[in-house]
Amino acid sequence: FADPSRVKVYGYGGALQPEWLTADYLQTTDDLHEVATCRLSDGRCLLMATGPVTWDSNHQRIRNPYANYGCYFLTEGDNPLTIDTETFLTNWQSHADRTHTLYEVDDYAWYQGGRNLYDATRITAANPRSITLQGAQDHDTGSLTVTLSADQATAVMVGVNGQNVGQLAAVSRGEYDEMRTATATFPVTELLAANNKVTLTPVNAQAVVRLDHISLYHATPEATPNLASATFPAPDIVGLVNNQNLHADGPADMIIIIPADRKMQEQAQRLADWHETHDT
């Protein structure tokens, strides 16, 4: 961009969109909304972006299983939507990320279906698992949520910093199940500013447990940054998007999505032609 002061940002980020689409929601979100940015005196442009994880009012994480990143569109024009530093910091102070820490690795599927992935590391009675989570300050209070999966019925003991906080139980799986899931939230005290050690120990010696995620809510929020001196993550440029007017397109019965490099265009066109000929 020749003039950064004209940069405008649009999009919704990576948050999970409602899976029940109403007329009001569609009308509200039909066009991408511009996102307010904060312009600093040193030329930096700050955006409070949303990734694929958000939090509800009960401190439970909401994962968008269809995205690993939050994406926004950049363009330029007159009168970008901006907010001052005071408003930006006020918004930041109420942001849920300041009071939550998440551990989640998605690299294992129990079966070829569904949308939830799990941590590939096997947790057994002989090989318990320890995870370290960041806090905000020593002697803090909060809550710990553990969600896991198991191939057979077992209780799992949960400890935090050497203290037992409770257990959660996965029930026996059905005849056509590969596993069952369990989740529980525990109140915790005497949290540390860093290196809170969470330990998971299955009781059933035969059970194999795999973690979905662990989230920690700490009552004390992270410190508010000094905008003038703090460093912030910078986004990556994924690519260019051509101007388009999707509103001009007619209704579609099927949409085929292919990579941007168009390597699958021939196959996609063949599939589309088949459906146009055979579908009624």
Predicted regions and their residues:
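Structured catalytic cores of large enzymes
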Residues: 3-262, 266-267, 273-279
